[in-house]
Every structure is written in structure tokens, then in C-alpha cells.
């Protein structure tokens, strides 16, 4: 099954979540190891360093040279084909403030002009793209999060919990197509 260039991983139809799961209450548990972002996103953040610095906590590093690792990797899942990683400080992404809020998101909101500094895959989490497959982030979500995670027999579907994130990745039409796939999948699995 495909939507555009993306293969749809069956986990999107099979994984269930616990009652009460809501990605808006996550307290940034997913940010603990930093994040991969397109090199163009990294460059945009550095170009707006002054805006980012204004919303940082006093203990966060102000020097943009300390925000990203120097290593750049080839990765076809990113628009430019190249990805960089945020640095990790104190066990979490360097852009996470003391209240566990993303300063890139805060800076974007402070700009008030539609500027998007928060990386694409941060906004999409727990949905990710891995080797051209649309899927749940294995490392973080399948093993469970302190705030919310996949569970056997849970009452909520990926669509219940991740609709906003799926729309971010697929767009409105892509989400509608994925929903139809899920309905067909449910019918095919229904006991006779």
C-alpha cells in the first residue's frame, strides 16, 4: 500500500494506544535524544539564531556552533537528502527548555509571521518516515513512553491519537486516503 511516494507500514493499522493517550500532553519525552533534521532546516535555525536566543533559558547554550553536531549523513527521507542532528545536553535536545518546551517552536510563535523553525519530524512525531515507509517511530513509541504509548488491546487507534501528525505528513487528501485504507484493513481482519 502506498500514498504518493510513501509505503504504508502495517503498524499504522495494527498498533493500539492506551485510553487517555494524547500526544499534546507528552512533556517532550521524545526529545530526550535530540532529533534529526534536514540540513536546510538546520541552516534556517542558524539564520534566525538571534530570535532563538531570545526565548532560550539562561542555562541553554547561546552559541549556534553548539546546537548541532558537525556530522551530516545522507538520508533519502529528508527533502535535501542530507540530515544533521541536534546536540544533546543533560540527556535531552539542546533546544528543550527547563519547562520541557521547544524553544524553536517558541521562537516561531514569537516571530508571528508564519516562520517555521521547529523541524518537520518533531512536528510529525510519533509518525516518522524510515526508508520510504510511513510508520510509528519504533524506538520511542513501540517501547512505550512515560506519557503515552502503544499497548496490546488498547481502545485507541493511530488515527485517534495521531490524526494531526498524520495530516502534517500526508496532507488532508493523504490522510483521507489512509483512513480509507484503515477501514478496508479493519474489514479484512474482522472475524466471520
Identify the residue ranges that each predicted region occupies.
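Short loop/turn segments that flank or connect secondary-structure elements
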Residues: 1-92, 96-192
Amino acid at each position: 500500500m502506498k500514498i504518493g511516494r510513501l509505503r504504508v507500514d502495517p503498524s499504522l493499522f495494527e498498533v493500539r494506544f492506551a485510553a487517555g493517550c494524547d500526544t499534546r500532553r507528552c512533556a517532550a519525552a521524545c526529545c530526550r535524544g535530540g532529533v534529526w533534521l534536514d540540513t536546510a532546516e538546520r541552516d534556517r535555525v542558524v539564520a534566525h539564531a538571534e530570535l532563538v536566543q531570545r526565548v532560550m533559558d539562561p542555562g541553554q547554550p547561546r552559541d549556534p556552533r553548539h546546537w548541532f553536531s558537525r556530522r551530516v549523513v545522507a538520508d533519502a527521507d529528508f527533502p535535501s537528502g542530507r540530515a544533521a542532528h541536534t546536540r544533546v545536553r543533560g540527556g535531552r535536545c539542546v533546544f528543550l527548555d527547563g519547562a520541557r518546551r521547544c524553544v524553536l517552536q517558541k521562537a516561531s510563535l514569537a516571530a508571528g509571521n508564519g516562520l517555521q523553525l521547529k523541524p518537520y519530524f518533531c512536528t510529525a512525531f510519533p509518525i516518522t518516515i524510515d526508508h520510504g515507509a510511513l510508520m510509528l517511530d519504533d524506538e520511542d513509541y513501540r517501547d512505550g513512553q512515560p506519557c503515552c504509548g502503544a499497548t496490546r488491546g488498547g481502545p485507541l487507534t493511530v488515527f485517534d491519537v495521531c490524526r494531526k501528525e498524520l495530516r502534517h505528513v500526508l496532507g488532508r487528501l493523504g490522510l483521507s486516503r489512509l483512513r480509507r485504507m484503515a477501514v478496508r484493513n479493519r474489514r479484512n481482519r474482522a472475524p466471520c
